[in-house]
Amino acid sequence: MLSPKRTKFRHQHRGRIKGISSRGNRICFGRFALQALEPVWITSGQIEAGRRAITRYARRGVKIWIRIFPDKPIRTRPAEIRMGSGKAKGSPEYWVSVVKPGRILYEISGVSETIARAAFQIVAYKMPIHTKFITSLRK
C-alpha cells in the first residue's frame, strides 16, 4: 500500500474539502480515465484495491497511472482511552488522499474502450464515491 517515505510533520489537521479540483482534472498520460464526482478521503487500501482490479481485469498490455497519492496521516483514538480531551493522540493509523470533485483517479492505455470501461466499472464499485469514465480527445 502507498504511504510517504518521510514527512516534514508527524500530524496534520483534518481540514475541510471545499470547491472543485483545479489541478489533476485532465487526462495527461493515458487514453481512458476514472474521474471523481464527489469530495472524499480515499485510503491507500482503496487505491491499491482499484489498481489490483485493473491489472486483474485488463491483463496484458495495459499501462496504469495512479494520479492520487495518500499523503495525509489519519490518527484514531487508541482503545480504552476516554472520550474528549482534544484531538486523537495516537500515531498515524492509515494514510489518505484528499480528493475533490473533478480529480482524475486512474488513467489507463493499451486496451480497447470496452475493456477499459468494464475495468473501471469494477474499480468504481470499490471506491467510496460516484465516479465517471472519461476518454481522451487525442487518438
Swiss-Prot record:
The keyword Kinase does not apply. Keywords: Chloroplast, Plastid, Ribonucleoprotein, Ribosomal protein. It is found in: Plastid, Chloroplast. The keyword Chloroplast applies. It comes from the Eukaryota. Its main location: plastid. It holds the Pfam family Ribosomal_L16. SUPFAM superfamilies: Ribosomal protein L16p/L10e. GO terms for molecular function: rRNA binding; structural constituent of ribosome. Gene3D superfamilies: Ribosomal protein L10e/L16. Signal peptide: none annotated. InterPro entries: Ribosomal_uL16, Ribosomal_uL16_bact-type, Ribosomal_uL16_dom, Ribosomal_uL16_sf. GO terms for cellular component: chloroplast; mitochondrial large ribosomal subunit. GO terms for biological process: mitochondrial translation. PANTHER family: 50S/60S RIBOSOMAL PROTEIN L16 (PTHR12220), LARGE RIBOSOMAL SUBUNIT PROTEIN UL16M (PTHR12220:SF13). HAMAP family: Ribosomal_uL16. Belongs to the universal ribosomal protein uL16 family. Part of the 50S ribosomal subunit. This is Large ribosomal subunit protein uL16c.
